[in-house]
């Protein structure tokens, strides 16, 4: 309670909170687009069942080429009606939200509640977060970037490798 009262609890929002607003979950998103490629659906399903979503995204990106960026933007860049428990976030957490989501659901929830974020940072600028919070700013940290640009995006295996390395 004490930590929460100080505003030191920061929610980490994943894709599940956007599904109720009509955005696809990762499995649905990836499976939806293999029909547009020559990827073997059974092999692709095996990759997904193994939980290797970054590898599945990489295969899809390789198969679609430049169209992959458009596919991501079309799936997650459209404004949809906000629904579900994500709407409670602005009423529970006031200073910062960290998300891996590409969509704008969290940002729009805070705007609708009259608590817009002072600033939105992509993951590549996450080191600035402590300073921004110390300045009293309400920050949305989009760790994996946004749907509107591949710059700073972390979705495919190559993008994970570029931003996070091999994990050692």
Question: Which sequence ranges carry the predicted segments?
Answer:
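Conserved catalytic-core helix/loop/strand module for nucleotide-ribose chemistry
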Residues: 1-168
């Amino acid at each position: 309670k004490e930590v929460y009262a100080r505003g030191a609890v920061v929610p980490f929002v994943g894709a599940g909170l956007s599904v109720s607003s009509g955005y696809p979950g990762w499995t649905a998103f990836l499976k939806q687009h293999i029909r547009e490629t020559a990827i073997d659906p059974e092999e692709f399903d095996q990759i997904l069942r193994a939980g290797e979503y970054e590898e599945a995204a990489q295969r899809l990106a390789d198969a679609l080429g430049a169209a992959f960026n458009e596919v991501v933007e079309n799936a997650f860049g459209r404004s949809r009606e906000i629904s579900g428990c994500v709407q409670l976030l602005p009423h529970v957490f006031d200073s910062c939200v960290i998300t891996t989501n590409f969509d704008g659901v969290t940002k729009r929830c805070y705007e609708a509640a009259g608590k817009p974020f002072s600033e939105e940072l992509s993951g590549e600028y996450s080191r600035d977060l402590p300073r921004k919070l110390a300045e009293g700013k309400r920050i949305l940290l989009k760790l994996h970037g946004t749907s509107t640009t591949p710059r700073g995006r972390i979705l495919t295996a190559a993008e994970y490798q570029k931003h996070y390395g091999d994990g050692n």
